[in-house]
Amino acid sequence: MYEDITPELIKKIKTQFERNMSRVNEMSGKSLYWKIRRGQATQADVSAYADWVGRAGSDAMKRVLKLDDLPDGTMYREIAEQTIVPVMEDMWGYVDTQAAIQLRRSDKIRGLNIGIKNASDPKQRIAQVVDMAAGQTSQEALDNALTDPVISTSRKFYDDFLRENADLRDSLGFEEVVIRKYDDRGLHGGKDVCLWCKEREGTWSLLDAHINGVFERHPGCNCLIEVMTSDKTRLQTDWTRNEWTDL
């Protein structure tokens, strides 16, 4: 039964997603896309681009996946898996590609000759979104499952890229510094301080970042996570004060 409707749903979602992405690249996301392509982008730019990719994917799925068109008005797991997974894999491809371009060109400018690692298979992260959408019988609940969780997962795709490349560089003897900046807009704008995020704010060694969950984020979190490969002539003497000492 599901096989009869899912191919058309997938086609519609992917078509809408690509349409959204062309608009992102040509309009609101143009400066980000071309800054990356021209080698002028920062990690903050790629993070913002990942956010746009998430919004493009979220919009495409919400436009097409209507419970009125599904058997029994229900988002059965089989349908969720067959429709959500393909577009989110495409989202991962967009983010990972641009992330690699930015890091490679940033390394070149700094004279660093280090290999770039593509982020690991995103199946586990995508499965979490499928879990939230599966079984929904309310359009509002389904749309909610396809909004913040999808956008946050797109950002996590980039977080994973940064984390895995930091781990690689650390294994090669480079000193990696993780910086997390609190988002005072977005989900947190005008609301109470998010203590969960504030606990992870600041500058961390890579080891401490892993221990304290600095690479993690909740749905709707727009905190900026950056990873820097330290210059060999710099040494951080006190991680708790976030102060640098130049040698």
Locations of the language-model features?
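Domain-core detector
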Residues: 1-218, 226-247
